[in-house]
């Protein structure tokens, strides 16, 4: 796997596609098509089952419902009813958690 240079900006989609195309020898257009299909597949899985396991040990996406609640409006002071809301939650895999623990933060001593 090719090591990427550290820069202030994350890789763009096209840069990721280029890196994968060079590493695998597959055309960039085909890589883009594969990612489109993967996106559709994961979204369909998430909608139908509320849980989606990401490939290659990346983690898991799941839909949870935030409970309804009553919240005070700070401007008027009246109590407002906030309805339940679906949220997408990401649970990273153990590998990602371990890798993130090794990252040196720029604000750390």
UniProtKB/Swiss-Prot annotation:
Record's superkingdom? Bacteria
Q: Name one GO molecular function term.
A: structural constituent of chromatin
SMART domains in UniProt: BHL (SM00411)
Coiled-coil regions listed in the entry: none
A family per Pfam: Bac_DNA_binding
The protein in question is named: Uncharacterized protein MG353 homolog
Organism, per UniProt? Mycoplasma pneumoniae (strain ATCC 29342 / M129 / Subtype 1)
């Amino acid at each position: 796997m090719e090591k990427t240079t550290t820069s202030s900006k994350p890789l763009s989609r096209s840069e990721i596609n280029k890196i994968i195309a060079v590493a695998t020898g597959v055309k960039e257009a085909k890589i883009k098509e594969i990612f489109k299909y993967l996106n559709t597949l994961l979204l369909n899985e998430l909608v139908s089952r509320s849980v989606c396991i990401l490939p290659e040990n990346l983690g898991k996406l799941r839909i949870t419902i935030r409970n309804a609640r009553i919240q005070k409006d700070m401007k008027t002071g009246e109590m407002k009813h906030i309805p339940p809301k679906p949220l997408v939650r990401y649970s990273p895999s153990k590998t990602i958690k371990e890798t993130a623990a090794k990252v040196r933060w720029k604000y750390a001593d």
